[in-house]
Each structure stands twice: as structure tokens, then as C-alpha cells.
A protein has these predicted regions:
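Conserved glycine-rich cofactor-binding loop
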Residues: 15-16
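Substrate-binding pocket helix/loop in short-chain dehydrogenase/reductase
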Residues: 98-99, 103-108
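Active-site helix of classical SDR
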Residues: 122, 164
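Residue(s) in the substrate-gating loop at a strand-loop-helix junction
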Residues: 148
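C-terminal helical subdomain
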Residues: 188-189, 196, 208-253
């Protein structure tokens, strides 16, 4: 396994859950990490933890659904940390419920963050990642897009969320085909049920539905997903892990 010494990673949605755990894991592997989210107080606390463990962190408060803000995140990372080798597109939102009475603004939020925000960050980062693949000691770079089992299996009540995650999968594989021969690896990580804040943005009746669906199940921890991401980006140059599907042992779908 290669280390990430001398590299820089940018992690979106880093204020909690998978993003927070991933930033800590990448920093522990040697990367300088730019942590991006809207909740600056949480990012500041995360940066303190990274630096207390001997790492380097850059806090960027931003909403990546704004294309200009997403681009500015990337440019600030390169300006202050010197380069960009790894992009982890983790920011996302899951808003579930039957189609019949669904608030349309929830669809807009999911499309804007889960799809467009991810694309904005990728578009801004790509020139820097291509450069890193040419001039870094690793001679490769990585884009890791966090999807979901919902990008493979559709369920009643989650149609728009499914659509965004199926879309992330299609975008990721198309991009992979474009850049793989230039040694930018594109990986899709698809978690099942994870104990994070993700479901907490839903309406009370939806939260009850989710609780019943996973009642008694030992869910994944954010660190389980962070371990998988770190594994992906620390493979030797000739190894590209294009997909990781990771569920709790007891989860059927």
C-alpha cells in the first residue's frame, strides 16, 4: 500500500459523518486535507483534530451547489496547499417520501447537491488532477464519488434520490472512460445503511419509515466507509478500484 505523503485531498461534506471520517483517515495516511462544508464551526473542530494528530488541514466554508463557490474551493485548495491529488465528492442529501405529496423543492435540493454539486467540483478539479497524475511521485490521481446502494436498487418512496444516485453512477463511469488512460482513477463508493446524519433531514413520518426498515440492524459506521475510500486511493498506480459496494452484513437490499 502506498501512503499519501506529499499529496493533497479535498473532501466535500466534511462537517460530519462519512466526510469527517474520510478527512481524518486521509490525513492519517499523510495527505494534507481541504475540508469543505457549510458548517464552519464543525470544520474548525475537525481541523483541530487533524492538526493535533500531526496533519495539515484547510477549512473552506462553502455551498458546492453554487458553481462559482465550488470552483473557488478547488482554487483555494491548490493555492494554499500547493496541489490537488484526490477529490472526494461526498456532499449529499437524502429526502424520501411518496411521490404523490412530495415537496418539489426537495427534488431540487437533491439534484442540485447530489448531482450538480458533484459535477461542479469535478469539473473544477479535473485540470489539477490531470496535472498531478503527470508530475506527482504517485503518477496518478483519484476522484472518489460517494453514491449509495440507492444507485443500484430503486425503492418506493425514494424515486428522486434513486435518480440522483443512478445518475452519479453513470457520470462516474463515463468520466472514468475519459480519463483512465491519463491515470486519473475514478471510483464509485456505494454505502448501504450508515449511522450518520443523512436521514435526519426528512419529515417525521419518513424518519419513522426509515427506522422501521432498519430496526435491529447493526448499521455501518462512517469509519467503515472512510476505510474503503482510503483503501481505494492508496492502491498502486496500476490498480483502479472502480466500484465499492458496502452494506451492513444484515442488509438485504
Amino acid at each position: 500500500m502506498s501512503t499519501l505523503d506529499g499529496t493533497t485531498a479535498l473532501v466535500t461534506g466534511a462537517s460530519s459523518g462519512i466526510g469527517e471520517a474520510t478527512a481524518l483517515s486521509l490525513a492519517a495516511s499523510g495527505a494534507a486535507v481541504a475540508v469543505v462544508a457549510r458548517r464552519k464551526d464543525r470544520l474548525d473542530a475537525l481541523a483541530e483534530r487533524i492538526e493535533a494528530q500531526g496533519g495539515r488541514a484547510l477549512v473552506i466554508e462553502a455551498d458546492v451547489t453554487d458553481e462559482a463557490a465550488a470552483r473557488a474551493c478547488v482554487e483555494q485548495t491548490v493555492q494554499e496547499l500547493g496541489r490537488l491529488d484526490v477529490l472526494v465528492n461526498n456532499a449529499g442529501v437524502m429526502l424520501l417520501g411518496p411521490m404523490e405529496h412530495a415537496p418539489v423543492e426537495e427534488w431540487q435540493r437533491m439534484v442540485e447537491l447530489n448531482v450538480l454539486g458533484l459535477m461542479y467540483c469535478t469539473h473544477a478539479a479535473l485540470p489539477h488532477l490531470l496535472r498531478a497524475a503527470e508530475d506527482s511521485d504517485r503518477r496518478c490521481a483519484d476522484i472518489v464519488n460517494i453514491s449509495s446502494v440507492a444507485g443500484r436498487v430503486a425503492r418506493a418512496g425514494s424515486g428522486v434520490y434513486n435518480a440522483t444516485k443512478f445518475g452519479v453512477g453513470a457520470f462516474s463511469d463515463s468520466l472514468r472512460q475519459e480519463v483512465t488512460q491519463r491515470h486519473v482513477r475514478v471510483s464509485l463508493v456505494e454505502p448501504g445503511a450508515v449511522s450518520t446524519e443523512l436521514a435526519g433531514h426528512n419529515r417525521p413520518e419518513v424518519l419513522e419509515m426509515i427506522a422501521k426498515r432498519f430496526e435491529g440492524m447493526e448499521r455501518l459506521a462512517s469509519e467503515d466507509i472512510a476505510d474503503a475510500i482510503t483503501y481505494v486511493v492508496t492502491r498502486p498506480r496500476h490498480v483502479a478500484v472502480n466500484e465499492v459496494l458496502i452494506r451492513p452484513t444484515e442488509q438485504q437490499q
